Curated annotation (Swiss-Prot):
Optimum pH is between 7 and 8.2 for monooxygenase activity and between 5.5 and 6.5 for farnesene synthase activity. Residues 1-28 are annotated as: Disordered. Involved in the biosynthesis of the sesquiterpenoid antibiotic albaflavenone. Catalyzes the two-step allylic oxidation of epi-isozizaene to albaflavenone. First carries out a non-stereo-specific oxidation of epi-isozizaene to give a mixture of the albaflavenol epimers ((5R)-albaflavenol and (5S)-albaflavenol), each of which can serve as substrate for the second oxidation to yield albaflavenone. This is quite different from most other P450s which catalyze regio- and stereospecific oxidation. In addition, displays a farnesene synthase activity with farnesyl diphosphate (FPP) as substrate. Homodimer. Heme binds at C410. Its EC number is 1.14.15.39, 4.2.3.47. Coiled coil: none annotated. Divalent metal cations. Mg(2+), Ca(2+) or Mn(2+) ions for farnesene synthase activity. This is Bifunctional albaflavenone monooxygenase/terpene synthase. It comes from Streptomyces coelicolor (strain ATCC BAA-471 / A3(2) / M145).
Length: 461
């Protein structure tokens, strides 16, 4: 199967007598009104993982809407690379209240291409070393703030460091702890509410003055107020540092006019919130991995000491820390922050021999794809060595794409891996970790995956 085989514009006409495209099978277990939404809400990870038993493409019902679920990694790669599938669908509709319609995360077509041109220079591989000193400082500040033997709330600490790195590197802002805490609290509420709105799309109910709806609306309003404060402070300062916020404030549209205020706002939201949320979630799962797999924490410590000779780990060491990187990738495989993605078919097309009608919403789960036993031996085992070159070559191409692929690939992939590597190396070098009584590392499903309430104790090495 090739990418071209799912592109209706490049697909060769069917030969006379060729079989007609099939309709995908329908998953069982739907109920009136809610369809499969109740199963997706009750146990979403199990539901999405079980769909692979029904075929490569499966029809499900979310409320009254038919949605096409894709379970085959090669077909998810085709979705990512094919321009006939746009960013749209239940996930993105649920995120519009946060991300807006004019940011790079939700835009399509010419607008998306122009926005990528604006932000991409900040994330080029040759631009990342300029952020190195900030990443180093934040990684080591994190280890200094924690005290041996004292319980650490992994949720708040992970989110705080993720927001600080993003703000200091990309916005050059001094909006640190107080705003990071506001962002952390508000995002937890907003992402939970948006997930409910995605899987059970009962719009009128979410407008009722119920306590959960009020909490959601208050948190969303505070997020947007926070972004407006950041933009206003930069303008009032008269400063123009070489950062992403300056690039946005000076960006032009296709007519050569300054971009609108709403687009600037939506772009800053896209910089601060989804990126910080996904990085923070990954740090939480890395802390769990360091606590639950001390042998790999020890290997990271040994690797760092071999590379640095005992000095503090630095940005210049990142590319040499191979096992550290493999631990990060394996943590992302088993617990991807972004566990579900959606697309919309612009035109009628063929996917894996099935007909996808124009306008159809398509959903797939990186969580399910990355745990598929057809792609991975010992698929549920935490095994960073599966990413050694000789073993990684056996993993299907699109069975592990934590930053997506094609034109919708996350632009900050190198930036994200650099900060995750520095933070993991700094933590594992200074401490061993153990979960404490009361810690709950069960998966909490929202727009992203987090532990419910991960509490760890650092133990000095």
């Amino acid at each position: 199967m090739t990418v071209e085989s799912v592109n209706p514009e490049t697909r060769a006409p069917a030969a006379p007598g060729a079989p007609e495209l099939r309709e995908p099978p329908v998953a069982g277990g739907g109920v009136p009104l809610l369809g499969h939404g109740w199963r997706l809400a009750r146990d979403p990870l199990a539901f999405m993982s079980q769909l692979r038993d029904h075929g490569d493409v499966v029809r499900i019902k979310l409320g009254p809407k038919t949605v096409y679920a894709v379970t085959n990694p090669e077909l998810t790669g085709a979705l990512a690379l094919n321009p006939d599938y746009h960013i749209a669908g239940p996930l993105w509709e649920s995120l519009e209240g946060l991300l807006g319609k004019e940011g790079v995360a939700t835009a399509n077509g010419p607008l998306h291409r122009r926005q990528r041109r604006t932000i991409q220079p900040a994330f080029r591989l040759d631009a990342i070393p300029a952020y190195g000193p900030i990443m180093e400082e934040e990684a080591h500040a994190l280890t200094e703030r924690w005290q041996p033997g004292k319980t650490v709330d992994a949720t708040s600490e992970s989110f705080r460091v993720a927001v600080r790195v993003a703000a200091r590197c990309l916005l050059r802002g001094q909006y640190m702890d107080e705003r990071a805490e506001r962002l952390c609290v508000a995002l937890a509420t907003v992402f939970r509410g948006m997930y409910r709105r995605m899987v059970v799309p009962l719009g009128p109910l979410y407008r009722l003055p119920l306590p959960a709806n009020r909490r959601f609306n208050d948190a969303l309003a505070d997020l947007h107020l926070l972004v407006d404060e950041i933009i206003a402070e930069r303008r009032a300062s008269g400063q123009k540092p070489d950062d992403l916020l300056t690039a946005l404030l000076e960006a032009k549209d296709d007519n050569g006019d300054p971009i609108g205020e709403q687009e600037i706002h939506d772009q800053v939201v896209a910089i601060l919130t989804p990126g910080s949320e996904t990085i923070a979630s990954t740090i939480m799962w890395l802390l769990q991995a360091l606590a639950d797999h001390p042998e790999h924490a020890d290997r990271i410590r040994d690797e760092v000491e071999a590379v640095t000779g005992g000095r503090p780990v630095a940005f210049e060491d990142v590319r040499k820390l191979r096992h550290t990187g493999n631990v990060i990738v394996e943590a992302m495989r088993l617990r991807p922050a972004v566990w579900v993605l959606t697309r919309r078919a612009v035109a009628e097309s063929e996917l894996g021999g099935y007909r996808i009608p124009a306008g159809a919403d398509i959903i797939y789960s990186p969580y399910a794809i990355q745990r598929d036993p057809k792609s991975y031996d010992d698929n549920l085992e935490f095994d960073p060595d599966r990413w050694l070159p000789e073993r990684a070559a056996n993993v299907p191409k699109y069975a592990m794409k934590p930053f997506s692929a094609g034109k919708r690939k996350c632009p900050s992939d190198h930036f994200s891996m650099a900060q995750l590597t520095l933070i993991t190396a700094a933590l594992a070098t200074k401490y061993r970790f153990e979960q404490v009584a009361g810690s709950n590392d069960a998966v909490r499903v929202g727009i992203t995956l987090r532990p419910h309430d991960l509490l760890v104790r650092p133990v000095a090495r």
